């Protein structure tokens, strides 16, 4: 029988620009996603986060929904430009008060907040000054973090500095598919380094001002070689260094993986060793976002990594084209334990986009593929705990169907369906399944489907 610890956190996750809506309300400033989504052709169907899930106005209803599901934690991000419209300087009291009210509502309903300080929505005013390419951003970010700590740390016990810095740099500075839309092999390493420096400065600020726990959230995608050939194994190591170790090695070990200099060549800056070592600030946990794995082969013609993904026959794939492979989540959590000294881990995002069929009788929304996905992956988390990984919580991505970045509203990750015309929320079967898992501390995972 599966049984999770009594103090295990069961949560859902969202991010500010994806669910809040009203991005310019009450004195807020524009972010790079406000700018990016309003640029023609960059987001599918011309979608924006102007309304999204209208969480800015409906947050009390959403908190009540979380309570009905039985969750005891909620991970959300704060919008930097809602709090500091120009990214620095004058504080927008109305924006800060929104998060103050949200935290109070969560706690009043027995839900522990986990606050992420940055989930991709950089203030546009700072992007105009170079954004993540400007070394001064580490100070700007630490100052913003301090504003949030002073306002909320008396009630918020878990903070995350950054969400998925790899996506910020890969999508925003290397390939240009995400805001701010740059495409440069030279810019990506600089943005990555400044993100990590900003993380370190925020952790330092927290040690001076905070009283609880702080960490970082990374997306990990384990790489498996397609064969035992030296070429496939080397390609797999390059892909792993680029996506997985590029961020965790500096955070935990104070150094970058050696493969990055090979990958980027002349575009890789030779950072002073003492500067890189400063990224290694003691943190209290690491958040792991996991969605899929990658089977990797050598490809001489593939740009940058000389590596390519190998599609798997007979595998199930999500609507975003990601293979469903739960064993890799166990492997990932155990790998973090072994490589980085068994830190406290939270699975801060895990979920899948599947096509939701029409409602059944009584507004029931059956999403059996998502139910199966959650069953397998939550079971995989338990398997990692059984192997000694210090996993303390699990957050489904996502509570709500929401704005899925450059894909607009075309992909639905929510365990709660959102009608974007009416804003009606309808729990799917996956939400009801998750509620039963929580109530049984995992016991229902082994029941027949």
Q: What is each stretch, according to the model?
A:
Residues 1-43, 67, 86-88, 96-449:
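Active-site region of glycoside hydrolase catalytic domains
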Residues 5, 55, 59-62, 430:
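Short N-terminal amphipathic alpha-helix/helix-capping patch enriched in small hydrophobics
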Residues 58-79, 281, 285, 339:
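Catalytic domains of carbohydrate-active enzymes, especially glycoside hydrolases
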């Amino acid at each position: 029988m599966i049984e999770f610890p009594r103090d295990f956190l069961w949560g859902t996750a969202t991010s500010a620009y994806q669910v809040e809506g009203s991005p310019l309300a009450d004195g807020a400033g524009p972010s790079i996603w406000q700018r990016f989504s309003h640029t023609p052709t960059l987001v599918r169907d011309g979608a924006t986060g102007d309304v999204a899930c209208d969480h800015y106005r409906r947050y009390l209803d959403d908190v009540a929904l979380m309570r009905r599901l039985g969750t005891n934690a909620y991970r959300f991000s704060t919008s930097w430009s809602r709090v500091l419209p120009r990214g620095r300087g004058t504080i927008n009291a109305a924006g800060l008060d929104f998060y103050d009210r949200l935290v109070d509502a969560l706690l009043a309903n027995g839900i522990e907040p986990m606050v992420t300080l940055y989930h991709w929505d950089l203030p546009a005013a700072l992007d105009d000054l170079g954004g993540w390419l400007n070394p001064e951003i580490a100070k700007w970010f630490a100052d913003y973090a301090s504003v949030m700590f002073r306002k909320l740390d008396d009630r918020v016990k878990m903070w995350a500095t950054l969400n998925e810095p790899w996506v910020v740099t890969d999508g925003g500075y290397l390939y240009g598919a995400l805001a701010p839309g740059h495409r440069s092999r030279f810019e990506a390493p600089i943005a990555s380094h400044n993100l990590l420096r900003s993380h370190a400065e925020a952790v330092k600020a927290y040690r001076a001002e905070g009283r609880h726990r702080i960490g970082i959230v990374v997306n990990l995608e384990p790489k498996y070689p397609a064969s035992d050939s030296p070429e496939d194994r080397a390609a797999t190591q390059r892909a792993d260094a680029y996506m997985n170790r590029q961020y965790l090695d500096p955070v935990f070990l104070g150094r970058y993986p050696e493969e990055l200099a090979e990958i980027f060549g002349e575009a890789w800056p030779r950072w002073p060793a003492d500067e890189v070592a400063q990224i290694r600030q003691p943190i209290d946990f690491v958040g792991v976002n996991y969605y899929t794995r990658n089977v990797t082969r050598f490809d001489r013609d593939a740009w940058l990594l000389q590596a390519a993904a190998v599609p798997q026959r007979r595998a199930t794939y999500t609507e975003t084209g990601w293979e469903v492979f739960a064993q890799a989540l166990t492997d990932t959590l155990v790998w973090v334990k072994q490589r980085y000294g068994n830190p406290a881990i939270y699975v801060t995002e895990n979920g899948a986009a599947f096509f939701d069929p029409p409602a059944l009788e009584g507004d029931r929304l059956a999403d059996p593929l998502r139910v199966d996905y959650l069953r397998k992956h939550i079971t995989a988390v338990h398997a990692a705990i059984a192997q000694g990984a210090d996993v303390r919580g699990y957050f489904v991505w996502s509570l709500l169907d929401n704005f899925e970045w450059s894909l607009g509203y075309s992909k639905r990750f929510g365990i709660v369906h959102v009608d974007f015309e009416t804003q009606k929320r309808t729990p799917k079967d996956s939400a009801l399944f998750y509620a039963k898992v929580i109530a049984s501390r995992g016991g229902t995972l082994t029941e027949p489907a």
